[in-house]
Design a protein with these regions (language model features):
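Pro/Thr/Ser/Gly-rich low-complexity, intrinsically disordered linker/stalk tracts
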Residues: 1-28, 84-89
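A generic structural motif
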Residues: 26, 75-77
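Recognizes extended acidic, P/S/T-rich segments that occur
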Residues: 32-69, 77-85
Length: 89
């Protein structure tokens, strides 16, 4: 089970100013995850899509736009998505 999603250590991540946010989550015993981030809440066009064995990842893609809400989600290899969002400044 994946829970407690955070961006830069914050659960309610409004006002993220960094261009390389750190996404983290509590992951129980799972050790393989897929992470997606999008500017669309339906994830129709992913800004980030990666697989990791860690309970965190660092965004290193194109610069994020100021004043925009981004949506992100994570799941274990066979699990359901757990979703969150954050806003940049």
């Amino acid at each position: 089970m994946i829970f407690d999603l955070k961006v830069n250590g914050q659960r309610k991540a409004d006002g993220i100013s960094t261009v390389s946010p750190v996404f983290s989550w509590e992951c129980g015993t799972e050790r393989q995850f897929t992470v997606q981030m999008s500017s669309n809440p339906k994830f129709q066009s992913a800004v980030m899509y990666l697989d990791t064995r860690n309970c965190y990842c660092i965004y290193d893609g194109v610069p994020l736009q100021a004043g925009k809400t981004y949506y992100w989600r994570v799941r274990s290899r066979v699990g359901e998505w757990t979703e969150s969002q954050f806003t940049t400044i």
